[in-house]
From Swiss-Prot:
Homotetramer. Forms an RuvA(8)-RuvB(12)-Holliday junction (HJ) complex. HJ DNA is sandwiched between 2 RuvA tetramers; dsDNA enters through RuvA and exits via RuvB. An RuvB hexamer assembles on each DNA strand where it exits the tetramer. Each RuvB hexamer is contacted by two RuvA subunits (via domain III) on 2 adjacent RuvB subunits; this complex drives branch migration. In the full resolvosome a probable DNA-RuvA(4)-RuvB(12)-RuvC(2) complex forms which resolves the HJ. This is Holliday junction branch migration complex subunit RuvA. It comes from Nocardioides sp. (strain ATCC BAA-499 / JS614). Residues 1-63 are annotated as: Domain I. The RuvA-RuvB-RuvC complex processes Holliday junction (HJ) DNA during genetic recombination and DNA repair, while the RuvA-RuvB complex plays an important role in the rescue of blocked DNA replication forks via replication fork reversal (RFR). RuvA specifically binds to HJ cruciform DNA, conferring on it an open structure. The RuvB hexamer acts as an ATP-dependent pump, pulling dsDNA into and through the RuvAB complex. HJ branch migration allows RuvC to scan DNA until it finds its consensus sequence, where it cleaves and resolves the cruciform DNA.
Length: 200
């Protein structure tokens, strides 16, 4: 329906961005890693996927076309809706997902809140032959995020959005703070925070 959106970034929240297109503000749901690349007042272009429900129209935005295609493929697996597919992309890069699914890595998939062992096994069974090999162009290198407290808010909101309690999210953010460095990488920090929560 809407393959991509190009326009000026009007606002960035902890879970979405508003892009102004022809005088209309489109609210687009994005992962923390994608949101970290956007700056208010600057132009941006996001590949998008529209999810139509009886009572809602939701636009999801992505860092690149590969992430969008992976999002849409994930939803073809039983029990995987758009929110869970986005959660998977928030926790794992597209290549990490490909490696986990083609390598029968249940443990990696169960890092995503909402995916248990049986769910991970079902995803592997249904997508193993369709997801393809790693491309080497995923988010492994990370995306620089704004300095200061902004990355903390993004990681915290990402964890809460994935279903973790506020108190647990706060502890996880505090635990990964020493890893932030001078140029924090929101996607990497979110994955690190999820690892600390899965060990708790």
């Amino acid at each position: 329906m809407i393959a991509f959106v190009r326009g000026q970034v009007a606002a960035v929240t902890l879970s979405s961005a508003v892009l102004e297109v022809g005088g209309v503000g489109l609210d687009i749901m994005c992962t923390p890693g994608t949101l970290a690349t956007l700056r208010v007042g600057q132009q941006a272009a996001l590949p998008t996927s529209m999810v139509v429900r009886e009572d809602s129209l939701t636009l999801f935005g992505f860092a690149d076309e590969d992430e969008k295609q992976t999002f849409e493929l994930l939803q073809t697996a039983s029990g995987v809706g758009p929110k869970l597919a986005q959660a998977m992309l928030a926790v794992l890069s597209t290549d990490d997902l490909r490696l986990a699914i083609t390598g029968d890595d249940v443990k990696t998939l169960t890092r995503v809140p909402g995916i248990g062992q049986k769910g991970a096994q079902r995803i592997i069974l249904e997508l193993r032959d369709r997801i393809g090999a790693p491309t080497g162009a995923g988010r492994s290198a990370g995306v620089p995020a704004p300095a200061g407290a902004v990355w903390r808010d993004q990681v915290h909101q990402g964890l809460v959005g994935l279903g973790w309690p506020v108190r647990d999210a706060e502890k996880a953010v505090a635990a990964v703070a020493p890893e932030a460095g001078d140029v924090p990488d929101v996607a990497a920090l979110l994955r690190a925070a999820l690892r600390t929560l899965s060990k708790a």
